[in-house]
């Protein structure tokens, strides 16, 4: 009996998709697919980053099991140090900040990203007058929110062209560098997997 043929190694994109599906739990998880970012792979983990000014600046936290996140951060830092670089983690979640509290990593809050639980949306709106005002204005302006089908996002579709135009106008209206890599818009890559 012949030994089984080994499966081909997963490509980097396939590995990332698998890690995002298993461990993608925050705002920046899908940014691992954005152009211009490097990917560091650990064992069953990955971190997207860019090299800036002697640092590896990570985009969000690691894609890994939550209980392994501190170990993964330390492995990433060791890899950066081998290249003469320090590390900075930008756009991480509060649970990760809490996990590093008793380590030699430091944390500093720079800003907040609004995050809501869709199951609790009615309570969120009830408790936020500014949000209610913005939603009312959007409604008066005829803006609606709905889930798009994959067909509507196909290359050449009117919806996709409109979304591209809106995204381009937004990006051109912002002064993005030096942290522009945090807001690169690659709206349609792996759109069938985005939630």
Language-model regions, residue ranges each:
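Conserved acetyl-CoA-binding loop-helix of GNAT-fold acetyltransferases
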Residues: 66-78, 87
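A conserved beta-strand-loop-helix scaffold within acyl/acetyltransferase catalytic domains
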Residues: 3-57, 62, 85, 90-106, ...
């Amino acid at each position: 009996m012949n030994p089984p043929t080994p499966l081909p190694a997963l490509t980097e994109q396939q590995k990332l998709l698998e890690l995002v599906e298993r461990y993608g739990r925050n705002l920046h998880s899908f940014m691992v697919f954005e152009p211009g970012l490097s990917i560091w792979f650990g064992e069953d983990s990955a971190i997207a980053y860019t090299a800036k000014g002697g640092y590896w600046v990570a985009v969000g936290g690691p894609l890994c099991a939550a209980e392994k996140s501190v170990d993964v951060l330390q492995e990433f830092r060791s890899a950066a140090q081998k290249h003469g670089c320090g590390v900075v983690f930008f756009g991480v979640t509060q649970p990760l900040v809490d996990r590093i509290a008793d380590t030699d990593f430091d944390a500093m809050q720079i800003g907040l990203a609004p995050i809501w639980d869709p199951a609790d949306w009615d309570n969120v709106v009830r408790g936020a007058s500014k949000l209610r005002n913005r939603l009312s204005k959007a409604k008066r302006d005829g803006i609606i929110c709905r889930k798009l089908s994959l067909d509507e996002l196909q290359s050449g579709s009117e919806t996709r062209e409109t979304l591209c135009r809106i995204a381009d106008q937004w990006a051109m209206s912002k002064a993005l560098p030096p942290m522009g890599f945090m807001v690169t818009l690659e709206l349609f890559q792996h759109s069938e997997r985005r939630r």
